[in-house]
Amino acid sequence: MRNLNRIIFINSANIPYADDIYLDGNIHFIGTQGVGKSTILRAILFFYNADTQKLGIPVEKQSYTEYYFPYSNSYIVYEVATENGPFCILSFKSMNRVCYRFIDSPYRKEFFIDEESRTAYSGTDRIRAILDQYDVDYSRIIYTYDEYRNILYGNEAGADMQRYALMESKQYQNIPRTIQNVLLNSKLDAEFIKKTIISSLNEEDTSVDLNTYKAVSYTHLRA
């Protein structure tokens, strides 16, 4: 079973550091206005849809990239649980847009933060050097949202990237749209969810793990 297990903020969205936001079950965010509920939900939504224009951010507010990645050492790390152990997706700003690197390891604080100075490493080259030091495999930098989504949803990703797929589906587009509608409180009916599942399963040349699909399309939508 594969699912988003945890989200880690490092110098992101006015959060100096937070690594205890677990998403491995039914989650209920509570709190008064301005405490960060929407901040967390938008970061979760961006994991699934990778679309800065469809996060429900008002036009008068800072963009997703500006707000979540104000510094050269601002990061959001997504930890994904799989049947073979967790992996991480590092998101960061480069050339004024969000980029990604897939890391074949569960989240470890020492990969991103200097233990002596207790500050986050500035720039991904330093993080890459630390990963090499710990002999951890990682992907090249993913510069486009389309490629990120194709990897995440197993849509013709290369053999070296298949380990990082939540599922395998060429017709995955309705999945992030469904999650987007739920998190943004948009209209969503049972018929649309049914069509989403059918369209993703109705593929002759694609292997789909039903348990994986249920975990993403049902468990997270209940959260």
Language model region names:
Residues 215-216:
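Acidic, proline/serine/threonine- and glycine-rich low-complexity intrinsically disordered segments
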Residues 219-223:
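Conserved small/polar residues in nucleotide/adenosyl-binding loops
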